Amino acid sequence: MADSSFDIVSKVDRQEVDNALNQAAKELATRFDFRGTDTTIEWQGEEGIILVSSTEERVKAAVDVFKEKLIRRDISMKAFDAGDPQPSGKTYKVIGSIKQGISSEDAKKVTKLIRDEGPKGVKAQIQGEEIRVSSKKRDDLQAVQALLRGADLDFAVQFVNYR
């Protein structure tokens, strides 16, 4: 019997993030408590998001609105990193970013976790920004997925390319 395998990745669907951003912008424009605060949310490059408002409290509330929209669109909070409010002239701004990919340090932690706590006979190999997990038994692969879902990792994980 051939080996079964799957890949562990940390990717975010940019279109879903864009939809969440547009929904948040619409809510910020229409909500009563944001009237007159000139609160905006927009993309900054490919991975960055910038939120601007007249007060520190309103910019924090805008971040909460955006996080709520991300959750509704099934995007993990581990994938969004919001900075601290920074004064910028008469306004406050928060620069956030969308984190994608598994760093080499995180990949080493995951492979060590699989080796130490996973079923015997499971192999984990680092391939760039993803990790390939293979085994002779599919049940072992499902046990590894359950292990990783239960683990407290610093990044969002998805399982793709199941063979």
Swiss-Prot record:
Organism: Mycolicibacterium gilvum (strain PYR-GCK) (Mycobacterium gilvum (strain PYR-GCK))
GO MF, one example: nucleotide binding
Residues in coiled coil: none
Cellular component GO terms, alphabetical: cytosol
Pfam families the UniProt entry points to: DUF520
Domain of life where this protein originates: Bacteria
Family listed: Belongs to the YajQ family.
CDD domains: YajQ_like
InterPro entries from the UniProt entry: DUF520 (IPR007551), UPF0234-like_C (IPR035571), UPF0234_N (IPR035570), YajQ-like_sf (IPR036183)
Role: Nucleotide-binding protein.
Keyword tRNA-binding attached: no
Keyword Nucleotide-binding annotated: yes
Keywords of the record: Nucleotide-binding
SS bond list: none
PANTHER family per record: UPF0234 PROTEIN YAJQ
Name of the molecule in the record: Nucleotide-binding protein Mflv_5248
